[in-house]
């Protein structure tokens, strides 16, 4: 006899989703991505602060016009990297909670192929298309 949840029957060794919470390959993949993204965020944030300090020391005391563009690009890259880091942290939390691999929209299973391509995926391909992701 299988137990049921609002998502359907519980399956797998941990009954937590299409990807068992204890499956080390997914945790290792996400942790590797987390470390790389943390390093990237750290480097970008340091580079931004160094560039901003250099701009403040520049002539005129302002960073207007052309001099502001590199700072803005660096800031955008930093923000994007922080979002990616947060996505990876959320995927790790879902894995620990047994929710990794379940679509947050339709509650259906996210195929392992999609997770392999996009380990932080929160939505199945159909729901992601509907959300414009």
Where are these regions (language model features)?
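Short alpha-helical
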Residues: 36, 110, 122-123
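A broad detector of the eukaryotic-type serine/threonine protein kinase catalytic domain
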Residues: 93, 108-111
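Short metal-coordination and nucleic-acid-contact micro-motifs, chiefly zinc-binding Cys/His arrays
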Residues: 96-99, 120-123
């Amino acid at each position: 006899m299988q137990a049921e949840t609002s998502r359907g029957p519980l399956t797998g060794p941990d009954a937590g989703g299409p990807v068992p919470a204890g499956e080390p390959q997914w945790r290792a993949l996400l942790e590797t991505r987390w470390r790389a993204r943390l390093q990237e965020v750290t480097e970008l944030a340091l580079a931004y602060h160094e560039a901003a300090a250099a701009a403040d020391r520049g002539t005129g005391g302002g960073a207007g016009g052309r001099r502001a563009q590199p700072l803005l690009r660096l800031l955008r890259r930093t923000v994007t990297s922080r979002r990616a880091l947060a996505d990876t942290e959320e995927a790790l939390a879902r894995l620990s909670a047994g929710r990794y691999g379940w679509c947050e929209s339709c509650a259906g299973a996210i195929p392992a192929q999609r997770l392999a391509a996009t380990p932080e995926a929160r939505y199945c391909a159909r729901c992601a298309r509907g959300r414009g992701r």
